[in-house]
Amino acid sequence: MARQIGSRSLARRSGRSQYLIGMRPSRRPLRGLLRMNDFLNAIKGLHHPEERPEGASRRTHDSIAALTAAALSTALIALPAIADEEPKYGGALTYMIPADAPPSFDGHRESTYATVHSVAPFYSVLIRVDPENPADITRFVCDLCTEMPQLTDGGTTYTFKIRQDVKFHDGSPLTAADVAASYEKIVFPANGQLSARSSNYLMVDKVEAPDPTTVVFHLKFATSAFLPALADPFNFIYEKAILDKDPRWYEKNILGSGPFKFVDYQTGQSIKGEKNSDYYHKGRPYLDGFTGIYADKQAVRVEAIRSDRAAIEFRSMPPSARDELVKALGDKITVQEGDWNVASAVTPNHKRKPFDDPRVRRALTLAIDRWNGAPAISKIAIVKTVAGIVFPGSPLAATKEELEQVAGFWPDIDKSRAAARRLLKEAGAEGLSFELLNRNVDQPFKYVATWL
């Protein structure tokens, strides 16, 4: 019997207002891929046995194999090395989802782990970060396509050939038309529709499916940001026939072509899936099924792991909760720690005064003491490294010295706040006060909001 806390993960084995704060997976193309793909790899069991890290659980039958050091954040792994073992089939994974419920099931609309951790196992995507090497966020592999495309027209045309052996869970064949329709919804949302990542696709001119096995993306200009944007793990492929009838159907319903079929959803309690015996990646998944349990209170999640009511949480815990589990479980648990690739984000509504004035927005970012705040909050909340828009330590990440030249990252907080006060005065917003909306989840939202 063993447990694992993860980085955003925790695992155990056994037999509208003016201002908003929230943590979300990054919307920049080179962020927001690693950690969410770690969850997808784990639940789908996508690693080859010879490349599995230490710590995979017997109960989860190597489906937790993606929780490597490269998976980043706090990880408590509690097993001897089993890299030489063959994968084992069967069993069910029970994992915690640190939320009361997803706002909707539509991955195109949402940007919260509450949605992707709930429904990603039911869906396919066009391409993804390589599950055999998730630390390399510049390498992408096919899920629904047959091979990665060769660029044409000076890098402005991407042509994908689509597999012909894929079926939706209702028995309908998945074709290029479904892929194109899904990306049309993501890239060019119709009036009244929300697309959380449409701004990542400003380079896209049009998407077309000239035949049932071909999808073509035509770009306005060549850019290396396009493939990372395509590989976003929220880009579920939906059935065109359903979207044509009701483009909002997927907000309240689930029907995909992924490794698991939807079984049951109890609002605020759980979501369940069962193995898709017709899954096109032969031999996967290893699990017979899974259950995700919702709990927005950390104490509930800690107790679930400790008492073996759940095997894993795919996010993190602050040091106090981590240490509590280590103390309770002793040598059955091992800690690995690293960085996150999510942002604790404060988002002003730039369409409302005074936040429509860039001087006010600049003043707000100047007032936040990131360098002193992050280390302090990290002692009681799941807050990690101060960073820019690219994952810290990755090839394109800004250095600390480079960040310190950016407004909001200056090392002298007194200088920053003096500049902030001047800007507010210039904008006629001295004595500014506002309502701060915050997610009703304890970690890390309430702690970060209180500090702010």
Q: PLM ranges: what are they?
A:
Residues M1-L76:
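Intrinsic disorder/low-complexity segments
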Residues R16-Y19, N37, A56, K88, ...:
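Surface-exposed binding/hinge segments that line
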Residues T94, T175-S182, P212-H218, G258-P259, ...:
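Alpha-helical secondary-structure segments
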Residues Y113, E147-G192, P210, V216, ...:
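Aromatic- and charge-enriched surface segment that lines or borders ligand/interaction sites
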Residues I127-A135, A231-P285, G289, A299, ...:
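Gly/Pro-rich hinge or "lid" segments in bacterial periplasmic/extracellular proteins
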Residues I186-P189, K206-E208, V263-K272, T291-R352, ...:
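Extracellular/periplasmic solute-recognition and catalytic clefts
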Residues F260, A381-E426, V441-F445:
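Structural transition elements
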